[in-house]
Structure formats: C-alpha cells, structure tokens
C-alpha cells in the first residue's frame, strides 16, 4: 500500500483541511507514513499570512525537491494560501510540484466520494469549516486575495456533518472560518452564526460547541445572547484587536475604535462573567509610534486576555499596506515590542491560572499525552490529570491543584457524562 505524508503549517482551518485530505488519500488506497522519506505522496498545506510562515513553506518545498531527485516516484501536492487563486504562477515558480490546487478545494486526480469526507474515528474535538474566504480586506492581510470572497455552507449541511461526527465519536465541534461572525450573509435565507449555534445545540450527544475566528465589528447582540443562553456553547472567544491605537486601527481598516472594542468586551463580560478571551496583536505596523504601541500594551493589560497571539508586522504582497505604506519601524524595535507583549502575556496568564488552584472545573477529555489524560475547560484552558479509568470523550469534573502559564494540573472528582 503506497504511503502519504502531510506537512501542514498555519491556522486550524489548514489543519482541518489536511485531515480531510488525509482521509481522502486513504479512500484512494494510501496509508499514512511516519515521515516524508517513506511516502509516495507528500502534501504541503501552506500558509503565507506572515513572511516567516511563507519562508518555511518555500524551504520545505525545496527539501522535497531534493527528495524527489533521489526518488523520482515521489509525488508532491501543494495547497493552501501559497497557492491562492493563481495556480499558473505557482506552477511556474515550483515546476517540480506534481499537483497544485486551491485552498479548501479537493484534488482532481482521483474519484471524489459523495457526502462528507470524514475520518472513520474522528477526534473528540472535531473541526468543521462553516465558510471560506473573507470580505474585509484589512490593509495588512493577504487572506482575501488567497482564499477569495466569503462563501458559507448551509445550516442543514453543517448540522448533518456535525451529527455524523457525533455518531462516529466526537463530543465537541469547533466551527472554523476566517470571519465566522459574517457567516450566512451570502446565503439566500440570510442565516447568522447565532442561528447555526441554536441548530447545532439540538444535536443529541454533542456536548460542546466552539467557534473561531471572530471579527469585533461583526459580533451582534444576538450572538452574545446565544452564547450566554446555550449551555453547549463554550464561553470562549477569539477576538482579534490587532492594535490599541485608533490611528493604527484606521490604517489597518479594522472598522472599529479602541473604545468600541472595549465596549464590546464589556458587553461580553456582562453577559458571560466567566468568558475566556483570546486576541491577536500586530506590533510594528507602518508608522506605529512608541506612544501608539503603549496604547496597545495598555489595552492588553486592561482586558487581561487568556492568550495573546502577537506577531511583528511583515509586508504581504498584494495588500494595501505593502503597496502604500512604508515598513518604517526598525526590526530591533519590532522585536522589543514583541518581547514586551510576550512578557505581559506570561505574567497575566500565570496570575489568572494561579487563581484557579483549588477550584473546580468541567473538562472534556480529548485523549492521552505523556501518560496523562488531556482535556480542556469550557474556557479552553488545557488540563492534565492522572487516572486509570478510560476517560477519552468523557465530560468530567476536576479539582485544580497546580497551575503554569500554559496548562493546569487536576484531580478527577466525578464523571459527568461518558
């Protein structure tokens, strides 16, 4: 049986798409190889949202080219945001790649089965892509140029897929999209994300629902109310702010001010006092002054996120920022600001996690890692515990006895659902 190997970089959507492609390869008669050197087919699922990510992809492709020179039978497949909408130019740049297809698409060199392409035994927490693309065109972001405009899947189709995942063993679904809060506006019935959450909540056996990523300007009160009232929907929200200074937010074309963002956070915390917030932040955006960075730092400190995904600005081709704005913040200053935010995050999360010691939490157990059970709280915090019981897929109550910045240690108190 020929082997396949997956190399994926980037967001959770890329991870979900790679899992689906892996299952398709298995239906075509391939088996998963331990390493690229043992495979007849290697898939590279690419990311170009940052320059560093794009460089990693290109480096990996050149490594595979050398591997192909040694093994002419090796087939290389490329998808993801490096491909985007222009396959011809990518093929010209990487002529040694055998198969190239757009992100979110399926390859055309084999028979595509009808229905959903799902693993026989999906993970406890399974991802579902509810929409592709983005219509926002933030000035720094390459995603709309590579994944195209927003295209949503119907509620009925998504509910069928979620129900089938649950039938095969999943207990949680994570809804994915570049901007899930604009879900449905392109469909004839004009449903919204809240409508989808209500529909999914009716699926028997589904214990939890998460979604990401959100855009602050598109979060409605209807969505907040749905999150607060539906017990299956986790009180966890990825809410990228990107900057704390209004001048920079306007230059980014984000569509809100820092005060509007703070007001939104206030409404979320009023509706769900236990909500866990994560954010994305760019430091060193063109023309960002020290004072403007200080405003970002203050915003991070005031809100107290459970996770801050911070990155130094890097120009992306095709974007308005790369075309019209000078990348004028020195690299050393970008690194300094990056380090300040990373240090703040560690301090903030350490303090928040330490406050959870001796408290109880509801955890969905996802599997084992290093001889311990691993799961997540409703807020998405990673929890490890020891037990000889078969806990995979169980919803349990635990008591936390130890905390670190990135995980919690706990003891089993009670199995709530098995």
UniProtKB/Swiss-Prot annotation:
Keyword Iron part of the UniProt annotation: yes
Chain residues that bind [4Fe-4S] cluster 1: 11, 47, 81
Location of the protein in the cell: Cytoplasm
Molecular functions (GO terms): 4 iron, 4 sulfur cluster binding; metal ion binding; N6-isopentenyladenosine methylthiotransferase activity
SMART domains: Elp3
Major location (coarse): cytoplasm
Entry GO CC: cytosol
Keywords: 4Fe-4S, Cytoplasm, Iron, Iron-sulfur, Metal-binding, S-adenosyl-L-methionine, Transferase, tRNA processing
Residue span(s) of domain TRAM: 354-414
EC number(s) per entry: 2.8.4.3
CDD domains documented for this protein: Radical_SAM
Binding site for [4Fe-4S] cluster 2: 134, 138, 141
Coiled coil ranges: none
Function summary: Catalyzes the methylthiolation of N6-(dimethylallyl)adenosine (i(6)A), leading to the formation of 2-methylthio-N6-(dimethylallyl)adenosine (ms(2)i(6)A) at position 37 in tRNAs that read codons beginning with uridine.
Family: Belongs to the methylthiotransferase family. MiaB subfamily.
PANTHER family xrefs: CDK5 REGULATORY SUBUNIT-ASSOCIATED PROTEIN 1 (PTHR43020), MITOCHONDRIAL TRNA METHYLTHIOTRANSFERASE CDK5RAP1 (PTHR43020:SF2)
Quaternary data: Monomer.
Protein name: tRNA-2-methylthio-N(6)-dimethylallyladenosine synthase
Species, as recorded: Dehalococcoides mccartyi (strain ATCC BAA-2266 / KCTC 15142 / 195) (Dehalococcoides ethenogenes (strain 195))
Name of the gene encoding the protein in the UniProt record: miaB
């Amino acid at each position: 049986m020929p082997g396949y190997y997956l190399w994926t970089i980037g967001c959770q959507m890329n991870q979900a798409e790679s899992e689906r492609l892996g299952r398709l390869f298995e239906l075509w008669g391939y088996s998963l190889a331990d390493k690229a050197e043992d495979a007849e087919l290697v898939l590279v699922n690419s990311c170009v949202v940052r320059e560093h990510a794009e460089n990693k992809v290109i480096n990996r492709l050149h490594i595979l080219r050398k591997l192909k020179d040694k093994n002419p039978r090796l087939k290389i497949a490329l998808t993801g945001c490096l491909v985007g909408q222009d396959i011809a130019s990518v093929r010209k740049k990487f002529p040694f790649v055998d198969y190239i297809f757009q992100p979110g698409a399926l390859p055309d060199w084999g028979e595509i089965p009808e229905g959903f392409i799902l693993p026989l035994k999906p993970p406890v927490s399974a991802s579902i892509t509810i929409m592709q693309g983005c219509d926002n065109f933030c000035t720094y972001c390459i995603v709309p140029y590579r994944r195209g405009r927003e295209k949503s899947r119907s509620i009925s189709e998504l509910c069928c897929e979620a129900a089938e995942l649950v039938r095969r063993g999943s207990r949680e679904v994570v809804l994915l999209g570049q901007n899930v809060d604009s879900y449905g506006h392109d469909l004839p019935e004009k449903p919204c994300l809240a409508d989808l959450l209500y529909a999914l909540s009716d699926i028997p056996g589904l214990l939890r629902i998460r979604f990401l990523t959100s855009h602050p300007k598109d979060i409605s009160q209807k969505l907040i109310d749905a999150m607060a009232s539906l017990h299956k929907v986790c009180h966890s929200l990825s809410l990228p702010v990107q900057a704390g200074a209004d001048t920079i937010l306007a230059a980014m074309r984000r569509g809100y001010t820092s005060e509007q963002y703070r007001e939104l956070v206030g409404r979320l915390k009023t509706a769900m006092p236990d909500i866990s917030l994560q954010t994305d932040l760019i430091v060193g955006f063109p023309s960002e002054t020290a004072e403007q960075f200080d405003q970002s730092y203050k915003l991070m400190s005031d809100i107290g996120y459970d996770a801050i995904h911070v990155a130094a600005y890097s120009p992306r081709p095709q974007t308005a920022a790369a075309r019209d704005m000078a990348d004028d913040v020195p690299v050393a200053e970008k690194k300094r600001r990056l380090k300040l935010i990373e240090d703040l995050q560690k301090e903030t999360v350490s303090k928040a996690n330490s406050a959870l010691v001796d408290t109880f939490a509801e955890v969905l157990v996802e599997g084992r890692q290093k001889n311990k059970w691993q799961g997540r709280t409703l807020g998405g915090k990673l929890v490890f515990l020891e037990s000889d019981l078969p806990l995979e897929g169980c919803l349990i109550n635990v008591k936390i006895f130890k905390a670190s910045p990135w995980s919690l240690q706990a003891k089993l108190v009670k199995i709530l659902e098995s």
